[in-house]
């Protein structure tokens, strides 16, 4: 979801603009660190990078892809929990299509072409660490916000906005 900044879509094979940030909550403190560029093009790469953090606390990734949409990735022993902010992005971005595949979302590509942006996935994936499902739903409904702005709002709601901003600043965004 989110407003579109680019006037033309970037082919799925290109490395998109954007950022990936790993977020860790340990002993009541938030820590954010940049993720590698492969996290924006491969769900498997994002999952692997997050799992390698090996934290005793909560770990999740925030992926902003071309400021068009975002993905939240939360690995767990029972399987990775996912949220895609705009399922229609699967038409143009491999990582969005990969998320839909992992969610077993059976959405016909023809249906996506005519659809308004809509989220797909687990709205409750952050509810145990401070972001109620209803609040995340409200953020996703704010279609006038770009993906990075929606992620900033999530960070503010959860209490790690300063840490997220510091990482994004270091990335030159």
From Swiss-Prot:
InterPro entries: tRNA_Adeno_NH3ase_assoc_put. It comes from the Bacteria. This is Protein Rv3753c.
